[in-house]
């Protein structure tokens, strides 16, 4: 029995082997190569090897606070943000007041989402940094964060003096997407129910998240006041006014949070589709024009703009003004022109 202590858990008894393998086992046993009656199954051969690359994230310590030019959040949203972030009255420097990654809720629900241990330090810092962003850009009526996952990753990434994301220090979309997906499993965030497929670009439309009641309770807000402010904002929302104008709702009817959230996501999906179509058309136009001489580029773009100007504006538009518009449009298409635009 001494030989049974170090045997693997998935080892099987020799009697359970195939006849050919039993013969091979007894040959090994008689030769002294087998010391136990339990046989470890042959491991699957693979060419996978641990790489030498670093697994550290690009941005190990992200942080985000509301800029001074932003208006202060009102109601319970402002209360939630102030519970997350504090401001030094002397220096004006902002820092975290509460770290959401250390909330007891994550410890209580850890096993329900398939976790055994606490968050790693890198994930803790990312989770602490993303919650002020979620609260800051959350709509008071639908509690939907008005940024897609890609836009959230760009917002939280470090930027240079010109406001551009530093590629070496960015928070990648895949990393943030995995974090938000785990928050959805915890039940503190919700995700847009339907993700439409864009057939032309062969990719899905942006996904949006919203803060659930469990998430607001973690932030320590007054749920009664939060619900009252939410209903008031929904009654004043543009989405409700659109439904009233379309005859879907009456003047005395209120819109539900689910319906408002679904309508909001539909509008964002349509805006994304429209923007992608315009970008694709501009790309095709640029590919066609870049093969032409500069003068021909300006002429083709001027004729294109002339057809799309309103009739009253096209009537009073001079050739010089139309040429300036064409050059400006060509520069927006990132086509190199030989001469600068006339002033």
Curated annotation (Swiss-Prot):
Job description of the protein: Probably functions as an initiator for the IncI1 ColIb-P9 replicon.
GO biological-process terms attached to the record: DNA replication; plasmid maintenance
InterPro entries for the chain: Plasmid_replication_init_RepA (IPR003446)
Keywords on record: DNA replication, Plasmid
Name by which UniProt lists this protein: Replication initiation protein
Region of interest (Disordered), ranges: 42-61
Domain of life per record: Bacteria
